């Protein structure tokens, strides 16, 4: 907590109920289109991120499917404040050759402002996969004054913005799930996983 003087509940609406809600929404959307998939899509909500990526590390050591069959990891962490910052940050866009041009086209078609970051490192669960040379994308709407405080409540979540981000992520995941080719990793590594 960044408010250690209080015993108030920290609901974590943006960090990271927004990401969990995004996963559930994407699961519903992708389920309706699953007959077109070439690959399985795993929806995973990890725990222990704040304590050192414990959940994603455990998964990578005990995967449901072999990690060499995992073609990408897409992470939604703090995606509930699009209206606050006016853009979604996407990390890992250069971890596979296809990511940057595809996401640019998708964002343009949806009129979503983006800020791209090439690296796949960072303090969230995607980093665990990137360390294992799996291409990653991490969607994030930025830090704010409610981060890790009791004031991170639902009334501050931009639900329309979260829906737009889900539109963008859906296009990216759908391309990964239906493209016959695996993404081509561009840099070695030092929740949503796609298998195929």
Residue ranges and their predicted role:
Residues 1-53, 169:
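Alpha-helical metal-binding/catalytic segments enriched in His/Glu/Asp
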Residues 3-12, 85-88, 150, 154:
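Glycine- and acidic
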Residues 22, 102, 164, 168:
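Charged catalytic carboxylate motif
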Residues 25-35, 61-65, 104-112, 170-181:
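Sec-exported extracytoplasmic/periplasmic mature domains
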Residues 46-144, 158, 162:
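Metal-dependent peptidase/peptidase-like ectodomains
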Residues 133-182:
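Extended, hydrophobic interaction surfaces within ordered domains
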Residues 179-196:
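PDZ/PDZ-like peptide-tail recognition elements
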